[in-house]
């Protein structure tokens, strides 16, 4: 090597080592996450954005459903009470309820103290007149003989107008759990139930894990003989999913590394060459993680799991180089021959991965950036570093023994052209008959939660009566008071819809926390003490109630007339306060993306069209309320982003086509490269559909990657040298690179995380077909 060459080699090594050091420095300061909301769209419509926020941080996302089973009902009830007592004193939980009265005391005291500001009855006509009071007393007399008579007898002297009962009726509507020994039980009586809500958001997995650990500790301290605890909820699923992602990333990467290493040893029979083969992979992975961390502020665990794919594709470059070094040649001369094709293959792969880079899903955008940076760095290390480190005189001599047999088999692939045409045409005809690929945009199909866990969650929800919202009204406003007033405007039309049978009921933050304007109106409607006393005296005539029995009532109304108005800050820590926090949301950002929203979950919706019509008539044009059908809107959201991904995929394919035309300047040669890729995508789609897989946006991403990785095979087949030795080594290198690719992506397909499994399985099948079809269609 001449001095100039040695200087360039040393410079390449220095730049490489400094780059690795910089990457390690950045990675050491980069946070890692497993928040699956990264695989929700980043910029949907305003209504869909609210849906995404609720999936991440809504009140339901903070809910933990707990069951204690095993043993007698008495023992289970005792454990439930001990657990609830311990958790109510835990700062990590905003509310804990197991059906005991103790858990409802703060809410009951709040409703009683502020009943005249909370009850809509305060502003009804004649409510505090002699006529209205007489009607209320007559109703009280009838209620005293009902099953609720004991409660009425206790509160009657202070609440003859029935404000507390009115509010309780207002909150009724959801299903209630069974009760035994004063605590909640499942329908079959075999499981005591608790409902805990964490202060931490559902997406804060670290905090969710700590809260769940505290819950386990409370059970351990309270449990009786033979008892066990089961737990479910979004926070539980998030924690288990993160553990699954972390486990898959390490497990799959380790297995892929071992299998590819065995393949390298079989082919090169040199531990040193084995180490060198993994340098492009390791360098690309470190660079990809560092750049993603700098660009996104954090690296998702799924991005690390996806790093296993670089073991397949990144090691391809080393295989192409090492395998094609013939005896008597060297790495530099071989690279001069390979580099134009290898460089074009890298560029086509980058075009394919760009479909991920511009995705509206932050998680997919991370995968795209990681892959593009990783492949470019892996190719650069192969080009500039490996020739310096590779021993002079190296040649993969085992290729000489393997190549003749492999070449004979490959040359016979041309006999498969007719079956190839039949299969491809049949696949195309089938897809045309179906009207296109059978895409599924069902959000539930992407859930990483195992079926048994989903079934347990469903059982606990049914037994405990936990909310499982399907329809939700979103009422936006510039500020919190505006949102409460918007919710109040919807009360009358929703009540009429309930009476018409369009829905069974609804919840509203204004039921718990009326707007300040409404509170002022109710306070102004309360009569002065002397006027109320005179009206009560007339209304009480002819009733069995003695004089002076309602003095507490007169006192409480007078106190309410001058009492401070209720704000969220003055509400005590309770389930009602948590309900307000879950239904009155301050949104981040400014303009249309900021402000506040009131959420009104609906129950038993029968006529969505009637509800939408009522909303249009009851809300102002500037900030109209919207009805969200959670499942429908979630599926529509994924459908719209799948269509966006389709356009990005087509853009990537067009970019590859333009790149090939600019490089080859021959329509025939471009066709020779693209034909096997198009056929591989077509047949892979059909095989996935016939296997019963639900094709999602992530399968579409996988198909775009089939083009990205398969283009290397078709390019090398199209440009293979006419010299027999070079052709043999080219085909052997393609075969072993494809095996490495199939190992990496095939293992990814076994992941329990739908994002990884969908992409891995699609690319594994498509990559193998790309090589097979390239061999079948190659010109001789």
Question: What residue ranges belong to the model's regions?
Answer:
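Solvent-exposed, non-transmembrane loop/terminal regulatory segments of multi-pass membrane proteins
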Residues: 26-71, 172-183, 320, 412, ...
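Juxtamembrane segments of multi-pass membrane proteins
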Residues: 417-540
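Hydrophobic transmembrane alpha-helices and their membrane-interface caps
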Residues: 274-320, 669-716, 746
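Transmembrane alpha-helices and their membrane-interface boundaries in multi-pass membrane transporters
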Residues: 294, 310-325, 339, 343-358, ...
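Signature of alpha-helical transmembrane segments and their immediate interfacial
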Residues: 1-34, 387-388, 392-442, 775
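Alpha-helical transmembrane helix bundles of large polytopic membrane transport and channel proteins
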Residues: 24-26, 38, 81-192, 207, ...
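Extracytoplasmic
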Residues: 149-266, 270-271, 558-657
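Pore- and gate-forming transmembrane helices of large, multi-pass membrane proteins
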Residues: 278, 329-359, 722-751
